[in-house]
């Protein structure tokens, strides 16, 4: 206690040696390891001429491993073997002809039985294929489901650009992805698709940046005013969100309603495709009536007018129509939601519970306020960075400080808001959009093929 009172403490790791000697020993060991690392580095440099041979050898053993992994799954005897698997229907005939021309064998192809779950191979155009990784991260289509990638890709790019919404940032993202795709043509396919998706997102960001007048935030204004003595402004083609945030909030809600209604419409499409007309009317049409009726009832109210800063007046007949749509939709959902139940009390109770899901719709629409939040965050942080950089003034030292703050600040802002836009755009697709019609759960189709990392194999 006496020693502790004057600052002594028990060592966390008692040693038998004097601390100074122990530290010297550790430094000697560190120097020895550094010497070994340097020697190993020299050995690696001497192996540089054999680099291409090592790449070839690496791919050779990679192919051998793939081959024997596949052989381990084949039923075979001393002289025969049986291979079963899946193949896209469009490729079946070509494979059969190629096998018959090269081997003595019997080939039989048939459609996948109804009770068997076939693996999923997505087939989309160049634009939609770039977003296949987003769909796969949630879950590939299950049996009987549609592939939502094409429609989702358009929504993804649209919303991503709206969240980042700076023309300069968008151009940087587009240019970096474009150059990477050109510089590394043999990159892994999934990485290629992701870069292509972000390239499209960069173009969307560029578009929304021009619409909102954002070029590194307000860099043009601040640079011209601070270092050239007069203010130059590039006007927004639409409006500036920092000056009118409530307008962006209203449009964010509008885009959210369109996005959600699109998901509900896709649910209706799948029901009609399966011949479920009654389900389409009860689970889709009635909800459209209720939601559209409530929206039309909300638009002329003072609450909406104060938020949107606009006064909407409908003719009496339209107000009556809106109320009628909402009532018909609500009563239909109440009665028909649990139409498979025979007990009328249970049926109404479950219908009331499903009708309560209107709060879920409100929550989903409010989720699109993140479009406002992230869009404003990008512009506000960029503006703060510009102002911080220009605080030193119009002199040589001030210019140097501005360049350093500008480069590092905007690099940080771009990185953090890129991450935010990616995460929140995925969230809007997975939770709000897919939640209306899509479940996923399919198994990916993984063909047996030669996969190399360094060498490209071409057949004559």
Regions from the language model: what does each represent?
Residues 93-460:
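Conserved, carboxylate-rich catalytic/transport cores that coordinate ions
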Residues 1-152, 180, 187, 191-195:
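Long, charged N-terminal accessory/stalk domains
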């Amino acid at each position: 206690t006496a020693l502790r009172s004057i600052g002594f403490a028990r060592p966390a790791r008692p040693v038998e040696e004097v601390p100074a000697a122990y530290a010297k020993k550790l430094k000697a060991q560190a120097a020895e390891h550094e010497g070994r690392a340097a020697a190993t580095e020299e050995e690696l440099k001497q192996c540089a001429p054999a680099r291409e041979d090592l790449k070839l050898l690496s791919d050779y053993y990679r192919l051998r491993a793939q081959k024997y992994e596949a052989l381990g799954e084949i039923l075979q005897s001393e002289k025969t073997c049986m291979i079963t698997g899946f193949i896209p229907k469009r490729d079946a005939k070509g494979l059969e002809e190629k096998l018959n021309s090269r081997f003595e064998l019997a080939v039989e192809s048939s459609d996948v039985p109804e009770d068997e779950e076939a693996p999923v191979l997505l087939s989309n155009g160049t634009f939609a294929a770039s977003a296949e990784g987003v769909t796969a991260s949630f879950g590939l289509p299950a049996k009987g489901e549609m592939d939502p990638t094409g429609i989702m890709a358009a929504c993804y790019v649209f919303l991503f650009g709206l969240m980042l919404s700076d023309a300069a940032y968008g151009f940087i993202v587009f240019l970096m992805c474009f150059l990477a795709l050109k510089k590394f043509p043999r990159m892994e396919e999934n990485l290629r698709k992701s870069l292509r998706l972000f390239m499209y997102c960069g173009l969307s960001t560029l578009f929304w940046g021009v619409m909102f007048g954002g070029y590194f935030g307000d860099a043009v204004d601040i640079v011209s005013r601070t270092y050239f003595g007069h203010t130059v402004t590039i006007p927004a083609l639409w409006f500036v969100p920092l000056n009118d945030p409530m307008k962006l909030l209203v449009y964010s809600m509008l885009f959210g309603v369109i996005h959600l209604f699109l998901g509900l419409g896709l649910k209706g499409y799948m029901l009609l495709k399966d011949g479920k007309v009654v389900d389409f009317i009860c689970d889709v049409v009635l909800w459209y009536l209720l939601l559209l009726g409530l929206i039309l009832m909300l638009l002329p109210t003072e609450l909406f007018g104060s938020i949107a800063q606009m006064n909407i007046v409908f003719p009496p007949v339209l107000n009556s129509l809106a109320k009628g749509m909402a009532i018909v939709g609500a009563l239909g959902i109440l009665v028909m939601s649990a139409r498979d139940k025979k007990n009328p009390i249970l049926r109404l109770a479950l219908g009331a519970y499903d009708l309560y899901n209107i709060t879920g719709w409100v929550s989903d629409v409010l989720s699109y306020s993140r479009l406002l939040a992230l869009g404003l965050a990008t512009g506000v942080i960029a503006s703060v960075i510009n102002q911080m950089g220009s605080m030193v003034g119009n002199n040589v030292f001030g210019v140097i400080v501005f360049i350093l703050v500008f480069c590092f600040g905007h690099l940080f802002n771009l990185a953090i808001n890129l991450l935010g836009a990616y995460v929140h755009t995925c969230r809007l697709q997975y939770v709000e959009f897919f939640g209306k019609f899509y479940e996923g759960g399919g198994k990916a189709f993984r063909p047996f093929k030669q996969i190399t990392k360094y060498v490209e194999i071409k057949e004559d």
